Amino acid sequence: MSHTVKIYDTCIGCTQCVRACPTDVLEMVPWDGCKSGQIASSPRVEDCVGCKRCETACPTDFLSVRVYLGRLETTRSLGLAY
């Protein structure tokens, strides 16, 4: 089952999410928006199992990578379900 994986421009290009993903959903691609010159990309979302290890590994305060498992997950992540 695939899930929606969003990469935000707060990504610092550290590769932590890529290394944490057990199914190789993520990869780094060139990007001029940060010092590292790269940003995470999710070309293989059909392989995402929803483990959210990428989110846990992300060192940014804004969780630059997010995995949305469905409608409830999306509203919860926005703080709307509480």
From Swiss-Prot:
Disulfide bonds: none annotated. Binds 2 [4Fe-4S] clusters. Cluster 2 is most probably the spectroscopically characterized electron acceptor FA and cluster 1 is most probably FB. [4Fe-4S] cluster 1 binds at C11, C14, C17, C58. It is a peripheral membrane protein. One of its GO terms (molecular function) is metal ion binding. GO terms for cellular component: chloroplast thylakoid membrane; photosystem I. Keywords: 4Fe-4S, Chloroplast, Electron transport, Iron, Iron-sulfur, Membrane, Metal-binding, Oxidoreductase, Photosynthesis, Photosystem I, Plastid, Repeat, Thylakoid, Transport. Its EC number is 1.97.1.12. Its cofactor is [4Fe-4S] cluster. GO terms for biological process: photosynthetic electron transport in photosystem I. NCBIfam families: PS_I_psaC. The eukaryotic PSI reaction center is composed of at least 11 subunits. This is Photosystem I iron-sulfur center. It comes from Trieres chinensis (Marine centric diatom).
